[in-house]
Amino acid sequence: GMYSIRRKREFCIYDNLIATSFIQDVINYLNREELDVPISAGVSELFNMDDEKIKNLYIKEIELDKFHGFVGKTVIHPKQVEIVQALSSITYEDYMDAQDIIKNYNSQIGVKKSSSGDKMNEYKPHYKWAKKIMSLAYIYGVLNKGVDYNELIKSKK
């Protein structure tokens, strides 16, 4: 591309300062209230998911994509699909928190301990997040209580 950079297999996209600066600009622009455009995370050219190091780095990158507000991820190889789909599913804990936040949005209290008991659900600040979680739950599904994405991508040997 423009900067003559190609990622090495030891790094995820967030380890590159130029890429993270661009990603930040895209998110800040497209995630504004008046636009609220869902943004798919960028592609990773590494697809040998039989290599545990590459697979774990890919998972880390998808987790960071989600943390930064991306929805889904562009895939270039069939071996990437199962991992992206598994990590796109909504955890039971997030689903329960989102339901609680939406249900209590107009509450006089404003904040309550989450159903898991380890964090606070702030109704006004987390409302937009909760709506997004509910939409994604409808699309990708919700994991059962006590189950995480690893159950969906266990090796099929």
Give the residues covered by each predicted segment:
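Expand to "…catalyze enediolate/carbanion chemistry for C-C bond making/breaking, isomerization
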Residues: 1-157
